[in-house]
Structure formats: C-alpha cells, structure tokens
C-alpha cells in the first residue's frame, strides 16, 4: 500500500506542468483597416479571404516560448524556457461601439496600432485611438513616461494593405504618430540598437512595419521580438537594464491576472490595522458567509406624526365618549 502511494505521488509530481504566463495586447484602428486579418495571420499563420465584421471585440491567442537567461525571476522560477500565451484583443473600430469599447481596455501590456496604407485618414486617426486607450485603459506594468496621448505601455504601428497601396501608387503614408513611435521607442530603450525595428531594408525608416495580410506577408520575426519584450517586461523584470543605465525604465509591480481578489478586497487588505494579527484585524469581506437571520426584526418608523406622544386606545375612547370631560369626581368644575 505504501508503495502505491509513493508511486502515485511521484506520478503526480511528474504530471505537474510549469505555469503558463500570458500578456494582453490590444489591436486598435479604424474600421476596415485589416485588424482581424492581422490577428488571424499572426495566430493561424495564413490569410483569411473574407473576414467578418468584428462585433465588439474578438480575442485571438498566440502560443510562444520564451527562453529566460540564468537570472531567476521573482514571479516565475524553474526551467529556463516557459510557455506563454499572447492574447490579441481585436477591438472593433466602428462608431456604434464607441461608448462600450472601454470595457475591453483592461490589464493592457502593449498596443498594436493598425492603419490602411491606401487611406491616409486612417493613419491620422491613430492619434485619436492612442488618446482613447490612454484615458480609459487599465495597464499592467506601465512605463514611467508615456508615449503619444500619454500611452504608458509599449506599442507598434503597422501599415496594412501594402499590396493595394502599391497598385494605387500610394507611397508609405506619413504621419506624426509613426515618427513619434520611432523616437519614443529609441528614447525608452525598449529594444537594443541591434534589434531596432524595422529589421528589413524594404521597410522605410519612418513608416513602422508594413504588411499585406491578404497576401500573408508580414515581418513575423519583428512581431515575435515585440511579444518577447512584453513578456520580459512583465515576468522577467530583472532582465531589464539597471536604473544606472541611460535606457533604464522604472516599473510598477506587476499583478497576476489569475488573482481572485477584487480591487475592493485589495483596498481593505491594505488598510488593516495590524499585519501580525491576521485573525483579529482581518477586514477582508467574507463573501462566502451568509448573513445571519434577525430574530427580532425592527419595524420601520412611521413617517407621519413620529414626534407626537402616543396615547393608549382606552384613554382616547374615554375622552371621546365623555366629550372631553374628565371622570374624576374630586375636581369641581
């Protein structure tokens, strides 16, 4: 019997897989620029002929492995190579979802801005998208300084429909946001000089990344490096440059997405009176306990004449029957 218990314990230990991490990346831009085609190309590795219109938001998941150096992390420990899931949140750019898009702007690790190379207005509107995400979004491991519109997380600008723009004679569209993205990424030092984007000579230096999702043409290596950088920022903060470096970043403590406590619970936990006495001063609300029934329910106060002194019914009847005259015999009227 003891042998089978030890054998079962060993099998359970071997079956336990290392924890998988996850990062969340928003994909935003005007309606019709090809965000859904981009997400499908990144996740599936192939183009989609007729993508359907996005209703609210759709999520695509990309699996990646990240090989950590010998330095250990405060969040993930163990083997040097781990599995990670990149959540690509494709947010609809239609105006009908403008009032509810902020529901999807939570726990953001990075942003992908997409514009149409054949329509210059879609690139000009990226500044509006950056401001919308910055104002209404909630970010994980924000940067010390913000990008365009105050965006506090890393981002990349991608120009789609390069095939259509080439046929129409449209050059790589110019815009202030892409130039600001290039200067901001270089200033923050998010990537070493050897890894700066774009990685191909066919990409002009002031346009960002160019792709043609319909023809399944995009820089897979560049996007993979972006995702690895976001993973490193959230889970392996000790790999980032030291504060003494010119390209250093100051990081806020990252929060796991699988934590079950709400913001209200965290507030009560921080405001406990003593840390040592967890039983007496634990102010976390007990959500799993039912409220005890009241033995003597209190009657609600009367809204009318609650300040007037109350009389017994018998005295009122005697007064009404005697026409207001007292029945005491010792009083001479």
From Swiss-Prot:
PROSITE patterns: RAB. GTP binds at residues 29-36, 90-94, 160-163. Gene3D superfamilies: P-loop containing nucleotide triphosphate hydrolases. The keyword Transmembrane does not apply. GO terms for molecular function: GTP binding; GTPase activity. Coiled coil: none annotated. Residues 242-265 are annotated as: Disordered. Residues 11-288 are annotated as: Small GTPase-like. Residues 242-253 have a biased composition (Polar residues). Keywords: GTP-binding, Nucleotide-binding. Belongs to the small GTPase superfamily. This is Small GTPase-like protein LIP2. It comes from Arabidopsis thaliana (Mouse-ear cress).
